[in-house]
């Protein structure tokens, strides 16, 4: 099973709010997911991102691939650097 970390769209029309979820790559964008690991609100200034960093790092170490947008969010939060350091420690 290929697992992705991606955004699930919530909110109303023209007022998007996203949840960062771990999901099977074959499931629909807003469909079934395995675990919710954070939120992203692009409408606030600056955009508000809340992440469960330990869970996100755990899933990526297990092989989950983040989408491009989620990868950018993780980079800004410093999570990709932590992943790189964790992989090099082994």
From Swiss-Prot:
HAMAP family: Ribosomal_bS16
Name listed for the protein in its UniProt record: Small ribosomal subunit protein bS16
Gene3D superfamilies attached to this UniProt entry: 3.30.1320.10
Gene name tied to this protein: rpsP
InterPro entries recorded: Ribosomal_bS16, Ribosomal_bS16_dom_sf
UniProt source species: Halalkalibacterium halodurans (strain ATCC BAA-125 / DSM 18197 / FERM 7344 / JCM 9153 / C-125) (Bacillus halodurans)
Domain of life according to the entry: Bacteria
GO molecular function: structural constituent of ribosome
Membrane spanning stretches: none
Family: Belongs to the bacterial ribosomal protein bS16 family.
One matching Pfam family: Ribosomal_S16
